[in-house]
Amino acid sequence: MFMTNPFDALSALISTDVMQMYIIVMAVLVAGGTILDMLHKKSAQYFFLDSAKNAKNAKRTVSTGEKAGLAVATIASEVITSSEFCSTKRRISHLFTMYGFILFVAASGLLIFGCDTFSTETLAQVWHTGATMLCIGGYWFWFFIRVDVNSEGVKWYQLRRADIFILSLLTTATFALIWSNLQSKGGVVGDMGSTTLFFGLFLIANTTLFSTVMWSKFAHMFFKPAAAFQKRVAHADGSNLNLPGDFDLSSPEVQARFPDIPEYMGKNPEDMGAGIRREAPNHY
């Protein structure tokens, strides 16, 4: 199964031109959904206004070269390794899901449009590996890591609109693997049997994934790198996202600036500890 291109057998029923057109339509839906999401939530407007506010409060000018370095650091940290996740389990789950999705989508495009650089067997392996990684990371997240399930007592089967993205992603990968397995054992999409059923479910889940961008969390993957980069620039220029600085409460200069500190906390305030980060939120 892992060495077989599932779209080869499918081409006997659905032409390659139709499959290619379907991918183009899905790409257009993602682009259109992202733009509509951006207009509806005014996220781009927020980023520009916040950037302008940070620029007014900046204590130094960040050079173009330094910004380029910050962009590279953002890609290497927040994008490639998802370092923004404090939980190791959540981070590993996200990396499985993210790279599985990238491999699955890229291999799908190359298998359908054709590629001379890689053999069909290699791309088929990448396609199946990507779908498997998606299932590992996605189901791990859905049943064990989701904050509302893990920490807030919500049952895993209680659904809401925010779950469209992860559920359509999971069902796409799951039905793709089942369809490919049945087809590799001699099943035919046109026989109106189980192979047809799971191919149809795969098609519905895949279409839902790419056509509901405006209502799902799909678009957030495009905004997260921009937000992470903006945060690094804000720390570099001293504006600190318009948040108060990290003061030493025992410093005479700080106490002179904020006289209520010695009045209510004394001249040598105690370390208040980790606060909310004292323990992981594993109860509700």
Task: Name each region found by the language model.
Residues 1-252, 278, 283-284:
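Membrane-embedded alpha-helical bundles of multi-pass integral membrane proteins
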Residues 251-266:
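Intrinsically disordered, polar/acidic, low-complexity terminal segments
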Residues 263-284:
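Membrane-proximal soluble helical/coiled-coil segments
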